[in-house]
Amino acid sequence: MAKKRDVWITEVALRDGSHAVAHQYTVEQVVKIAKALDEANVPYIEVAHGDGLAGSSLQYGLSRTNELELIEAAVSVCKQSKIAVLLLPGIGTMKDLQQVAGLGAKMARIATHVTEADVSAQHIGLAKELGMETVGFLMMAHMAPVEKLVEQAKLMESYGADAVYVVDSAGALLPHEVRDRIRALKQHVGVEIGFHGHNNLSLAMANSLVAIEEGATRIDGSVRCLGAGAGNTQTEVLVAVLDRLGVKTGIDLYKMMDLAEEIVAPMLPAPQEITRDSLVLGYAGVYSSFLLHARRIAEKLGMDARDILVELGKRKVVGGQEDMIVDVAVEMAKKRAESLVQ
């Protein structure tokens, strides 16, 4: 019998964690992890390329195994957990959504930049038609004022989303900023609210707890912190903390501890740490994809890549605007040269 839950956790190690293993998951690994998560009574397990359905590419990183095989394998071993997928319109297509629904995925999480919810309308609509639980995923949530976030969440709600997430893609939000956003959504949006954190400033756990305090009932976690950058909120730790707080997750804590230690840890190429790189991404509030570009141009111009990333963050440059990195760096180099002449 399913345990009562106050908060519904989605485990993202098999999607966000794909970044940490360079998208090299095998069917055997996915089966092992998904089966253990199912036995621990985790309600949702997200499986896909790190950048969502159809993300396998030279630009985003090639998958070792076709994600459809991974999704099918996860579905086959889960008796109670539902398999979720992430789809970014423009990368994943309506056809991709239909395929995974046919394989048995039960939840679709449709992700857009925080100011671009309008591009999710068709995909949310299709997911609902396919009978999938449907989530709106507003990424880079630190880049929009609270009023804009509310407006965009209401759009996703109007398209049929069952829940809307505040997604801290860059791990840049501070606890009071999470509080303001979740509180506003709870006041103005009629569906469930969720939070997806990244640990680049070591705040994923604190931010998740603040979100729950403000009424979020959907929280993302990643076992052993396996995710992009410094990883996500560590699921087994989150379950323990929520248990101490009297918040019911319905998840077996000891089984989560064991699968983290015995199954996931040996698969990691390196422990998830807050490195200089992930820290600067959280500090600057920019996409991780900017890092290598900034490094290359900084080397050519004799600059510190961190200065470029911080300036890009100030200008609120978003994913897809990688060409701006060169423009901003050249402009900064010119200013520096002028100041030396003076």
Curated annotation (Swiss-Prot):
Domain (Pyruvate carboxyltransferase): residue spans on this chain: 7-257
Site entry: Transition state stabilizer: 15
Chain sites annotated for binding Mn(2+): 16, 196, 198
EC annotation from Swiss-Prot or TrEMBL: 4.1.3.39
Any one Gene Ontology molecular-function term assigned to this protein's record: 2-isopropylmalate synthase activity
InterPro entries: 2-IPM_HCS-like, 4OH_2_O-val_aldolase, Aldolase_TIM, DmpG_comm, DRE_TIM_HOA, PYR_CT
GO biological process: catabolic process; L-leucine biosynthetic process
Reactions the enzyme catalyzes: (S)-4-hydroxy-2-oxopentanoate = acetaldehyde + pyruvate
Residues where substrate binds: 15-16, 169, 196, 287
Pfam families: DmpG_comm, HMGL-like
Family (UniProt): Belongs to the 4-hydroxy-2-oxovalerate aldolase family.
This protein's name: 4-hydroxy-2-oxovalerate aldolase
Source organism of the structure: Geobacillus stearothermophilus
Encoding gene (name): pheE
